[in-house]
Every structure is written in C-alpha cells, then in structure tokens.
C-alpha cells in the first residue's frame, strides 16, 4: 500500500510499476494499479476514485516534438499537457493514455487501446486510436 501526496489510500501492485514525478500525480480513493504500469507526470495527472488500471498501462503527460527533420528528435523538446482520469474508470491491459486527454467518469478502455482524444463520461472505447463503440448509460 502506498499513499499519494494527498494521503488518500489506494493500492499499487508495485512489481515493476513506476511513477515518475510523483509530486504531480493525484490519486483518489480505492484505486488499483496493476503491475508494470508506467506513469510519467511531466504535467499534472489526476486519477479519480475507484479506478482500475490494468497491467502494462502507460499514462504519459509528455511526448517528444519531432516535426523538424534537421534537428534530432531528442533535442526538439516536449509536448506537455495534463491528463485527467475520472471516477469509476477501467483502463484495460496495455492501454496508453496520451497528453491532454480527459477521460470522463465511468469509462471503460479496452485492452491495447491508445487514447489520443478526450472521452465523454460512460464511454466504452477500443482500438488504435481509441474510438467509442458504445455507451454504458
């Protein structure tokens, strides 16, 4: 069991899970973070209460710029935006959440999906990139 900086209890299955810049991460109550999860908070990441995060999930609030072919990608800086994950969300195994995404309450993200755009509450989304296939409500 770990405690985030807001002192809210949640469970982190700490087998090979990493949270980079943990002071920028806020995690609600009763969350489960499975093994091999990688969270990089170059900007703020907010995870609501009762969230299930499957194994191998990547939540990354920053990515490299790459548009100028005359400059090495590593020297072009980063695109950094906050991520918000609502309450009662399930992120299936090996999903990836990209910078700037807001995932509404009650969403289900299918295994292997890459979420590049925000999702309204109670959406079920799958695929690469993730697309809404139905609503829970």
Regions from the language model: what does each represent?
Residues 1-24:
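Extended, small-residue-rich solenoid/repeat segments and analogous flexible loops
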Residues 18-27, 32-101, 128, 136-137:
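Flexible, glycine/small-residue-enriched loop-and-beta-strand segment within the central core
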Residues 52, 107-108:
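Short alpha-helix at the nucleotide-sugar/activated-sugar donor binding site of glycosyltransferases
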Residues 60-61, 110, 116-117, 133-135:
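Conserved acidic donor-binding loop of glycosyltransferase catalytic domains
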Residues 101, 112-113, 119, 128:
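Short beta-to-alpha loop/turn elements within the nucleotide-binding domains of ABC transporters
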Residues 104-107, 120-122:
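Conserved catalytic segment of ABC-fold P-loop ATPases
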Residues 119, 123-137:
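C-terminal end-helix/capping segment
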């Amino acid at each position: 069991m770990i405690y985030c900086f807001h002192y809210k209890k949640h469970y982190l299955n700490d087998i090979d899970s990493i949270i980079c810049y943990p002071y920028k991460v806020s995690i609600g109550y009763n969350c489960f973070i499975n093994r091999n999860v990688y969270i990089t908070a170059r900007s703020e990441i907010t995870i609501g209460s009762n969230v299930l995060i499957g194994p191998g999930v990547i939540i990354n609030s920053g990515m490299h710029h790459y548009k100028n072919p005359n400059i090495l990608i590593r020297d072009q800086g980063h695109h950094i935006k906050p991520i918000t994950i609502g309450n009662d969300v399930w992120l299936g195994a090996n999903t990836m959440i990209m910078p700037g995404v807001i995932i509404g309450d009650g969403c289900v993200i299918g295994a292997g999906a890459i979420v590049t755009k925000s999702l309204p509450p109670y959406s079920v989304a799958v695929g690469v990139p993730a697309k809404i296939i139905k609503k829970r409500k």
